[in-house]
Amino acid sequence: KTAVSEHTDWADWKANWDKIKTNYEQVALIPGSDFSKLNFGWYSKEKANEAVVRIADNKDMKNAKEFKGTCTEGTVINGVQYYSNKVTADGFEPNTTYYYQVKLNGKWQQAHEYKTGDPHNFSFMYVGDPQIGASKGQVPNESAVEQSEDVAARNDAYNWNKTLNSALAQHPEINFLVSPGDQINEPAGNNAEKHLLQEYEYSGYLSATAFRNLPQAVAIGNHDCLTTSYQNHFNVPNPFTAETNSTVAGHGYYYTYGSALFIVINANNYNAADHKALVEKAVKENPNAKWRIVVMHQDIYGSGLDHSDSDGIILRNQLTPIFDANDIDVVLQGHDHTYARTYQLTSDGKQYDDFAEYKVGQHGQDHKVLDNKLKSDSAFKEYYTSQNRCYTIADMKQGTLVNPEGVFYMTSNSATGSKFYNLIEQQQDYVAARSQTWRPTYSVINITDDKFTINTYDAQTGTPIDEAYSIIKR
C-alpha cells in the first residue's frame, strides 16, 4: 500500500493536487559538463527568441550575470503547445552560495539559492525508480478503493517529496541527485490522453521543493523512453547524439564532478555498440578522472524477481567486457525495485551469444519477443541463463576494499514506495547483499580523491538497511 503521512501537510497536498499536477513549467537543475557549470531546463507556454537565466551572489540579484540558451518547440499538453527552454550557466566556484532566476513567459521568476560543494569531497543522493504513478491499482491506507492513475500520481509525488526532504534533513552534505531512470510511470507513447497523464506525473516529480536547489542527473528508464518529454524537461550535458539506436526520449550523456566521471547510458537502446562508443568517448575526453561511474536503468547484475533473469540482463554479456576494458569502478542501476549489491565482478573474457535476433525492433519498454521465448521454451531459458554467466567474482571482501579488481554493481530499491518487486527465489552467486524491506530507501554516496563510500537508508526512519561499502584507490 502507498504510505501516507500522518501530518496535516497531507491534507494540504491533496487539496492542492490539481494545481500541482498542471504546473508543467517547473525548473529542473542538472549538473553541467563539469563542476563549474550548471544546466537548466523548463517548459514555457510562450515562445522566446532565447531562453534566459541570470546568476548572482545575492538574493536581490544585484549585478546578476545573464546566460542565454535555446527555446524550441516541445511537448503538446492537452492541445496546448509548450516550449522547451535550455540554458547552461558557468563560472561556479567551490563552496559558494549563488542565486538564480529564470525568465518564464517574459517574466523573471522568484530567485532561488544554489550552493556549490567541494569537488574534492562531495556527496550525492542515489535513488531508485521514483516512478510517480506506479501505485495505481493499489489500495491506500485511507481508502478501501483501488487508486486511479491520477490518485496514484498524487500519492507517489507526495511520498517523493517526503523522501527527498527526509534525506536532505539527515544528510545536508548532499550536493546533487542521481536517478537511474523511471522518473514517471506512464509510458504514453503516441496516446495523447496518456501523454497528459504522463505530464501530470512529471509535474508531481518536479514539484519536490528540494529541486529548487538540488541538481539532478537522471537516466532514461523504460517508462520514460517512449516520448520526448524526458529530453524536453531535462537539459543533460554532453548528450551522445551519435547514438544510432536512440529512443525518442533522448540519448546517453556524461559529465564530471571533481575527480569523478559519470557516464549515463540509455540502456533502453539494445545496441551495445552505441554504449561502447559513449563510454570510450567519455573516458578519452576525461583520462585523468580518478573514478569512473556508469549510471543505467536496467540492472544487468540485480536480484529482483521481475527482471534479473530475463529482459534486464539482455545486455549483460556485452556490457560487462566494455566496462572492464574501460576500467569502470561502479555501476549504479535501478529497474528491479529491490536492493542488491554485488561483489567485485570482472568479465571472464569468453565469447557469448548476443541474442541479436531478440533485439531487432525491441527496446527497454518492448521486449515481448524475448519474454515470449523465455516463457514458452524452457531449453531456451536455460541456454539464455548459461550465456549470461559471463563474469568472474574477482573479490568477495566486504567493508572497505583497497585497490580491488573488477566492477561494483548496485541496484537501488524504490525511493517512493510506488512499486516493489519480490526478490528472485535463488540468490545469485554474484550478490553480496540484498533485501526487500517493502519501504522506500535511498543511498548516499561520498567521493573523495581516493575513496568511494555508499550507505543506504530507510527513507522514513533514516536508519541504515545495510553496512557501508567502501573502495579506496591509491
Where are these regions (language model features)?
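Acidic, histidine-bearing metal-coordination/catalytic regions of metal-dependent phosphoesterases
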Residues: 1-147, 169-170, 402, 420, ...
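Acidic/histidine-rich helix-loop elements
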Residues: 66-79, 126-162, 187, 191-194, ...
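Extended active-site neighborhood of metal-dependent phosphoesterases/phosphodiesterases
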Residues: 86-89, 97-116, 139, 144-150, ...
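Active-site-adjacent substrate/metal-binding segments within catalytic domains
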Residues: 126, 159-178, 184-189, 265
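Active-site neighborhood of phospho(di)ester-bond hydrolases with catalytic His/Asp-centered motifs
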Residues: 126-128, 176-182, 216-222, 265-266, ...
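Active-site environment of divalent metal-dependent phosphoester hydrolases
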Residues: 132-136, 184-188, 220-228, 271-273, ...
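Short acidic, glycine-rich surface-loop motifs adjacent to enzyme active sites
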Residues: 180-187, 286-306
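Catalytic-core region of carbohydrate-active enzymes that cleave or remodel glycosidic bonds
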Residues: 200-208, 314-336, 439-440
